[in-house]
Regions:
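Compact, well-ordered interaction domains used in eukaryotic information-processing assemblies
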Residues: 45-57, 61-66
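Conserved, aromatic- and glycine-enriched, well-ordered alpha/beta core segments
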Residues: 34, 41, 58-64, 71-72, ...
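Extended alpha-helical interaction segments
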Residues: 1-41
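Basic, alpha-helical nucleic-acid-binding regions used in initiation and control of genome expression
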Residues: 5-9, 23, 57, 69-123
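Generic preference for hydrophobic/aromatic residues in regular secondary structure cores
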Residues: 29, 45, 79-80
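Residue-level signal for the start and early helices of compact helical domains
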Residues: 11, 15, 36, 64, ...
Length: 123
């Protein structure tokens, strides 16, 4: 995997997610409560859009680290394909553990935010 392709994909994620949302709206919904865990999306996206696998993974990285995606991993047993249909792949315990850890990190950052803003206001 090309690290530079992955980094470029991650940095361009915001605009590329909009492209993915236009092409596969059920896989990349705008509303957080509609998000579902994806089934091996990177290779299919790379093939469909002519991207490298590393670039596609980079684009998807911020998406799967979002709070809404982590919550979806914990709430849904089945993963979905890009067209929104249910995949045969299930959400495994490792994915649930990673989502739980990520949500804890997000919560800790949110808890620190008022303190950080107060400190910035004093400067």
């Amino acid at each position: 995997m090309s690290k530079s392709d992955w980094k470029r994909g991650a940095s361009e994620s915001r605009q590329q997610i909009e492209l993915l949302r236009a092409r596969w709206p059920k896989a990349f919904p705008a509303k957080g409560h509609e998000v579902r865990p994806l089934a091996n999306a990177a290779p299919a996206i790379a093939e469909a859009l002519g991207w490298s696998n590393a670039y596609a993974r980079g684009v998807l990285s911020p998406w799967v680290l979002r709070e809404a995606y982590c919550r979806a991993v914990l709430a849904h047993a089945m993963r979905i394909n890009l067209d929104g249909s249910e995949s045969e792949l299930t959400v495994d315990d490792e994915a649930r553990a990673m989502a739980t850890a990520r949500l804890a990190l997000i919560a800790a950052r949110k808890a620190q935010e008022p303190e950080r803003k107060a400190q910035e206001g004093q400067n």
